[in-house]
């Protein structure tokens, strides 16, 4: 029995890729290992968006040098965006790596692992570059393999990512994604619908639709029939079992009135919109080649507020210290953040990425210390706005999908919830996911199988129930109350004391305090209060 250890750095796309690779390898008889020592196959899923993410991967590879020397039979593979961009560099810097596989070739991983194990040597599978052939050939080389979902790899069984789009054609000057993920393509709507049904059958109550510019989603069938995001949301809305539908990350120019009206009219669709602005200066936006002006972004915000009203929650991304950014241009960003009053923002210092249009053409001339100061200043402005915004929730009752124990209880069940991972943008998330051998599931040969897991749907639901039962017994033995965490429909984090029996349910929570960017609450329904009282008396 082969054992796999997988480490993931990067965005939700990478987390989803890892989930699918694990599912594929489990079908080959693999189990998950908790650490590299107990694994015979080690995969690093990588990100190239920021230098910090690449440094994490090379740091991990450095630690694996000794492991490989002492255990040459172990297979080490690098997958994801770094693999697509730097395959030969990876082999030069870490010659003990056995395989390098780009994000569009993940279906080849099982075969390449076996080939490396039998034949030895180094093996590569990457997609065509953006200028390496005809457009259709390039697109086909970046297509992801059929979804095989592995719910035990998710932070919890109740929330799942669903890819609806791959690639990007925006070519922002700072961004490497169009090179590593390939041309923008919308998946067939029927494939998306079928996968959403699978996720609902597995117990997912909330799905998050993923795309580099997800609201640009477009699929044109052979009859020239167009399907856009608004059409897709309408269709997914009718799936039984799903309670919430979110989507990230959005592009400002494609936040159309039609899409906003669809969000308004479909109660399952979250009014949380992550729409990166990146800069409040037209001059900087032009250098970034973002494709819109500050005025157009303001118009978009006006459409959102007019259509969704107070229900809307908009978050954003910002890059400070981009090439040539002056004090005045940075101040324009500060002023616009104060004007737009985002729910939250993710703020990052610019770092030049080799292979992007900015590298070598635009000087990275803002000193690091200036970048750091601007990062801290803008973060302080945004945090003040977020805290003021959260004050408006005091005394209100909000519906919360309860994800699991908060970080205070994370040591015991540290794979149930990760607050940060579910809010950061596709471009900027750093996250490590490590498999848990206790959750490995054998493939079933029964007839009524879920296409996602290869297991009977009822059997999987029993697996989830068993996992919850074990967690409940652990807390009940300790006699402790548990601080739980969850999210509102508009993606605000809420923590409160309650019974673990509430995990996976959507409950009304009364908000009585705030702590930083977190809402503090208490259960308010008779049933939920009863569960809390039962927990206290046990």
Regions picked out by a protein language model, each given a short descriptive name:
Residues 87, 211-222, 255-256, 277-288, ...:
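Flexible glycine/acidic-rich beta-alpha junction loops that bind and position SAM and/or redox cofactors
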């Amino acid at each position: 029995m082969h054992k796999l250890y997988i480490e993931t750095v990067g965005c939700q796309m990478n987390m989803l890729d890892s989930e699918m690779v694990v599912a594929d390898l489990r079908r080959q008889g693999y189990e998950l290992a908790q650490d590299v020592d107990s694994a015979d196959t080690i995969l690093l899923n990588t990100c190239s968006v920021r230098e910090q993410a690449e440094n994490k991967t090379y740091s991990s590879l450095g630690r694996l040098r000794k492991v490989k020397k002492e255990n040459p039979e172990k297979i080490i593979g690098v997958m994801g965006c770094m693999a697509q961009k730097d395959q030969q560099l990876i082999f030069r810097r870490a010659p003990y790596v056995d395989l390098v596989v780009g994000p569009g070739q993940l279906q080849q991983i099982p075969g390449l692992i076996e080939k490396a194990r039998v034949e030895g040597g180094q093996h590569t599978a990457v997609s065509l570059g953006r200028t390496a052939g005809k457009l259709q050939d390039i697109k086909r080389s970046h297509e992801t393999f059929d979804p095989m979902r592995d719910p035990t790899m998710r932070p919890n069984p109740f929330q799942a990512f669903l890819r609806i789009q791959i690639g990007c054609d925006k070519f922002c000057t700072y961004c490497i994604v169009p090179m590593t993920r390939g041309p923008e393509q919308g998946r067939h709507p029927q494939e998306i619908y079928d996968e959403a049904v699978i996720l609902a059958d597995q117990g997912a109550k909330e799905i998050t639709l993923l795309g580099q510019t997800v609201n640009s989603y477009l699929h044109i069938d052979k009859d020239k029939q167009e399907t856009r995001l608004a059409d897709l949301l309408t269709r997914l809305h009718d799936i039984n079992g799903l309670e919430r539908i979110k989507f990230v990350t959005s592009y400002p120019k494609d936040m159309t009135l039609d899409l906003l009206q669809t969000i308004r009219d479909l109660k399952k669709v979250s009014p949380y919109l992550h729409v990166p602005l990146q800069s409040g200066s037209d001059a900087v936006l032009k250098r970034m080649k973002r494709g819109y002006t500050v005025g157009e972004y303001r118009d978009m915000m006006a459409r959102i507020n007019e259509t969704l009203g107070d229900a809307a929650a908009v978050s954003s991304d910002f890059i400070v210290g981009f090439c040539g950014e002056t004090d005045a241009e940075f101040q324009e960003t500060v002023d616009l953040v104060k004007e737009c009053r985002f729910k939250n923002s993710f703020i990052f210092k610019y770092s030049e990425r080799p292979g992007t249009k900015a590298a070598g053409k635009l000087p990275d001339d803002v000193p690091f210390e200036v970048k750091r100061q601007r990062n801290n200043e803008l973060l302080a402005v945004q945090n003040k706005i977020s805290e003021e915004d959260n004050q408006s929730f005091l005394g209100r009752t909000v519906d919360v999908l309860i994800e699991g124990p908060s970080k205070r209880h994370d040591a015991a069940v540290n794979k149930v919830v990760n607050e940060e991972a579910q809010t950061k943008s596709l471009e900027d998330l750093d996250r490590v996911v490590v498999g848990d051998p206790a959750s490995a599931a054998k493939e079933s040969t029964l007839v009524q199988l879920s296409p996602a897991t290869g297991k009977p749907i009822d059997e999987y639901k029993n697996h989830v129930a068993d996992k919850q039962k074990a967690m409940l017994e652990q807390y009940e033995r300790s006699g402790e109350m548990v601080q739980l965490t969850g999210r509102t429909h508009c993606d605000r984090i809420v923590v409160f004391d309650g019974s673990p029996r509430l995990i996976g349910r959507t409950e009304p929570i009364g908000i009585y305090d705030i702590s930083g960017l977190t809402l503090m609450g208490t259960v308010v329904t008779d049933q939920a209060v009863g569960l809390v009282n039962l927990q206290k008396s046990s």
